[in-house]
Amino acid sequence: MNDGEAFDYIVVGSGAGGGTLAARLAEGGQSVLLLEAGGDPRLLSGTNDDQPGINRLPDDYDVPAFQGFASENDAMRWDFFVRHYASDAMQEKDPKYRRYYRGVPVNGILYPRAGTLGGCTAHNAMILVYPHNADWDGIARLTGDSSWNAEAMRQYFERLENCHHRPLERVLAAAGVNPSRHGWHGWLQSEKAVPAAALGDFGLVQVLLDSAAEAFEDVGQPIEQLLDLVEAKADPNDWRLVTENAVGVRYTPLATRNHARMGARERVLETAEKHPDRLRVELHALVTRVLFDDHNRATGVEYLKGERLYRAHGQPSTTEGELRQAQAAREVILCGGAFNTPQILMLSGIGPRTVLEPLGLQVRVELPVGKNLQDRYEVGVIHRMNFDHWNILEGATFNRGDRAYREWADRREGVYISNGAVLAAILKSRAERPLPDLFCFALLGLFGGYFPGYSSVTVAKPNYLTWAILKAHTQNRAGEVTLRSVDPRDTPLIDFNYFEEGSDVAGEDLDSVVAGIRFVRRLTAKLKADGLIAEEEQPGDARQTDEELKDYVRTTAWGHHASCSCPIGPRDGGGVLSSDFRVHGTERLRVVDASVFPNIPGFFIVSAVYMVAEKAANVILSS
């Protein structure tokens, strides 16, 4: 690409926000430059710390069961080390805390991000779960913009989805009857992954049946609906369940095509192939700042051309990169995510004066960029089973060439078509809550959060069962992203200010997570009595009181859905963006990614970001 070349739109970042938006703008007839700091994960060579010298790509990208390894593949991973607490004494209680990594001071907890084409859709667990209607209605009330209400927003899910896990509903939709309001012709395929071999694993079947029966009773769901799990009716994305029956046992749809990962990468490349004259994808391009004229109009971006330039990269380069510029005839749209979009804005002079001026940056527009950072709290209830291995995992090494891999590669069958989740339950932590706030799901493996090497630990012992608990709708809005330095290759400083350090002074979040642990213990009580579970290793039977469980949650909780750091809302109320994604105090500059939400939506962030990107494309093309 020629330095200074002009396009209608420049989109920065190719994840769920940027990749989706760039493709839709190009389909709408606009010329688009999509800038991505990383490379194409299916064309790179990459390994992980436990298997040096062995290239695990493209399998780490493609194979659903390898999703943990994808997040630690050094060709595409960006390692952020974040603080959960400002207090060193509190932070160091977390066993995931690292003072140093690879000899470099990091002083935090690993927070895996993906610096690659497709962004975090290249390494996530592919779970596609619809947000709550109240999430959209809340934005509509905050902004006075009715186009954000839940009824209006559903069209964007229908536009992007190509549902393949409701065959009967698909037939009805072809006849013009679509009460589920799934999408059937969108670009993102969704599937249900239930390996047939699971039915032959009697230990697993008993675990699933006993856990499901207890969960049905606990949430007040008729046990007769257990068959819905088999018949694909326990669908968390069905419009009727979203609006009328939000609690219960569910399966977890995955964003896969023919049981291989599908995400923003596929959307971008397939659109670029159809419209090469409209969509230009520039890889290995690290954006350093937005360029403006004298009237705060965005005119383009400055970026560094070169591989592995960002210091979060798994193999950061020591070269400086080539400084280039690109011009936008219409708009610049930042889609770098909840960490990198605030960083780019602040390096461009848009942010808190208290952050910019001490670093010698001129304040162009003073806005609370980087404030309001939110995430979900997650913890694991980890069990060692009373047998050597799950039968379904026999012979599985999670490497290319084993029997399970051949089943996946040759026939798209077997355990590797799944991300490891086998059952989920949605519930309220307290009966009086207006919305469900807990998503509890069972995983075959040992998973207690993120630390260097976690992906190998998760699958190393084939006789573990982890119930992961996600706490939605946090009360804590005290997280913050700030600049470490004026060097765009440095990572920002990130502090989530967990629990009592944050804004949840009443302790509602902590109480809710403890309620989730007690729910899981009710599900597993029969499994323990029947001798299937040998031991609850974490939190462990020694922790029984509320205070003991709260201490466990405080010291081990994690998150991986960072959002809300450039929220939509009135400027005088702490908002950074207008309801049409424009940055307050500027022209021709928008943000479209997970940072735009005033409050973190639903249980899993990616479906909401995809929807936001589709809405943004509609807004931009309509204007």
Language-model regions: role of each:
Residues 1-623:
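N-terminal redox-cofactor-binding region of secreted/periplasmic oxidoreductases
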